[in-house]
């Protein structure tokens, strides 16, 4: 046992000497990993003999030393093969030949001269992610197992390199756009240059507008049209909405004319009946009827949507909006209910917009969770 402890001490002393030497030669890095293999082999043997401590050092379990030994063997053999290539005389430091560098994407190869690439999802600085573009990537050929150096490249699609006529991506920004972004667009900032999103296919977007409930309460065809519009582009959707609004406005005007012909109230009664139409209360209750075009001439009227659903779902959705979507609307209300509907468990959240274009941009960008009903409307503006 003393011989095993002495051999372990000598091995670890040599490892410390290499750390202090801080060499940039490949031979020293190969020696370092050879000593790492020897250290794990000695610890494995000590554990097999029933030792849990060697001096003040704890002997790891067999599974731990076995895994570390395999890792050291993999890197050691790779560096030995690299020594027979044309890049053996290049500077190689402990950092360049570390296990962490070996496992960093692209994996199972050696990388040098990293350059930071910043990707801003949705064009927002708050949603920026940083990646590393390796300008020198040493990969192994598929045919002769020889190590060759290729250049790391960047495009709007991701980070990649060309090897043996094949383009190999090791980072695709599209995958992270589903996690960090909302619109499926991003800008790449590298070396003082910006690569913009020049082609966006709305079909491949990860954001859609579900229609769990009727978006328009005044007609029976509007929910079906809203569902079909989820796959349309913003310009087509805007034109379709304006067409629906115009048809609904004409229907409402015809109904009002028929009511005026069938009912002939006295002048005073007619004047009294018209006065409540300009009150805030009537506008609040009229938000279920989507005819905002008829109110665009009123400077005190603003577009809104009412979200109806479970109170907890509404609170969570409002919290997410305040964190990442606050530029798409003016303000949001607290969770509220109608006092006359005590048995109804549904609640409401009202969202205000500065313009109808902002509301359309919100609906085409934000994905409303299932179970929350969206009701378009308009309200009098107050502060």
Swiss-Prot record:
Residues 198-296 are annotated as: Disordered. GO terms for cellular component: host cell nucleus. InterPro entries: E2/EBNA1_C_sf (IPR035975), Nucleotide-bd_a/b_plait_sf (IPR012677), Papillomavirus_E2_C (IPR000427), PPV_E2_N (IPR001866), Reg_prot_E2 (IPR033668), Regulatory_protein_E2_N (IPR036050), Regulatory_protein_E2_N_1 (IPR042503), Regulatory_protein_E2_N_2 (IPR042504). Phosphorylated. The keyword S-adenosyl-L-methionine does not apply. It is found in: Host nucleus. It holds the Pfam family PPV_E2_N. Residues 218-228, 261-270 have a biased composition (Polar residues). Residues 248-260 have a biased composition (Low complexity). GO terms for biological process: DNA replication; DNA-templated transcription; regulation of DNA replication; viral DNA genome replication. Residues 1-206 are annotated as: Transactivation domain. Plays a role in the initiation of viral DNA replication. A dimer of E2 interacts with a dimer of E1 in order to improve specificity of E1 DNA binding activity. Once the complex recognizes and binds DNA at specific sites, the E2 dimer is removed from DNA. E2 also regulates viral transcription through binding to the E2RE response element (5'-ACCNNNNNNGGT-3') present in multiple copies in the regulatory regions of the viral genome. Activates or represses transcription depending on E2RE's position with regards to proximal promoter elements including the TATA-box. Belongs to the papillomaviridae E2 protein family. Binds DNA as homodimer. Interacts with protein E1; this interaction greatly increases E1 DNA-binding activity. Interacts with protein L1; this interaction enhances E2-dependent replication and transcription activation. Interacts with protein L2; this interaction inhibits E2 transcriptional activity but not DNA replication function E2. Interacts with protein E7; this interaction inhibits E7 oncogenic activity. Interacts with host TAF1; this interaction modulates E2-dependent transcriptional regulation. Interacts with host BRD4; this interaction mediates E2 transcriptional activation function. HAMAP family: PPV_E2. This is Regulatory protein E2. It comes from Human papillomavirus 3.
């Amino acid at each position: 046992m003393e011989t095993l402890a002495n051999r372990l001490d000598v091995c670890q002393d040599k490892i410390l000497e290499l750390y202090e030497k801080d060499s940039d030669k490949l031979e020293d890095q190969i020696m370092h990993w050879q000593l790492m293999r020897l250290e794990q082999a000695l610890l494995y043997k000590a554990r097999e003999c029933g030792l849990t401590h060697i001096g003040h050092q704890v002997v790891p379990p067999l599974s731990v030393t076995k895994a570390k030994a395999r890792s050291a063997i993999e890197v050691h053999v790779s560096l030995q093969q690299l020594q027979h290539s044309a890049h053996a005389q290049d500077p190689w430091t402990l950092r360049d030949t570390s296990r962490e560098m070996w496992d960093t994407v692209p994996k199972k190869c050696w990388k040098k001269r990293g350059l930071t690439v910043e990707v801003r999802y949705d064009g927002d600085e708050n949603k920026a992610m940083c990646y590393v573009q390796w300008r020198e990537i040493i990969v192994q050929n598929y045919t002769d197992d020889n190590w060759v150096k290729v250049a790391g490249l960047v495009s709007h699609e991701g980070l990649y390199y060309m090897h043996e006529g094949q383009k190999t991506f090791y980072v695709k920004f599209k995958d992270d756009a589903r996690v960090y972004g909302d619109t499926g667009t991003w800008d790449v900032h590298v070396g003082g240059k910006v690569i913009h999103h020049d082609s966006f296919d709305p079909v491949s977007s990860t954001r859609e507008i579900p229609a769990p409930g009727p978006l328009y309460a005044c007609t029976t065809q509007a929910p079906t049209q809203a569902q079909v519009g989820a796959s349309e582009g913003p310009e087509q959707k805007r034109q379709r909405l304006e067409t629906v609004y115009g048809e609904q406005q004409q229907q409402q005007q015809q109904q009002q004319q028929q009511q005026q012909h069938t009912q002939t109230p006295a002048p005073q009664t007619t004047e009294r009946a018209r006065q409540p139409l300009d009150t805030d209360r009537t506008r609040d209750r009229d938000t279920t009827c989507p005819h905002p075009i008829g109110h665009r001439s009123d400077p005190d009227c603003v577009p809104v949507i009412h979200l109806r659903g479970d109170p907890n779902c509404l609170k969570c959705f409002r919290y997410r909006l305040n964190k990442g979507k606050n530029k798409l609307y003016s303000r949001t209300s607290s969770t509220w209910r109608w006092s006359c509907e005590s048995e109804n468990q549904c609640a409401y959240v009202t969202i205000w917009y500065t313009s109808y274009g902002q509301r359309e941009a919100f609906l085409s960008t934000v994905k409303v969770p299932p179970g929350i009903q969206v009701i378009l409307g308009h309200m009098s503006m107050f502060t």
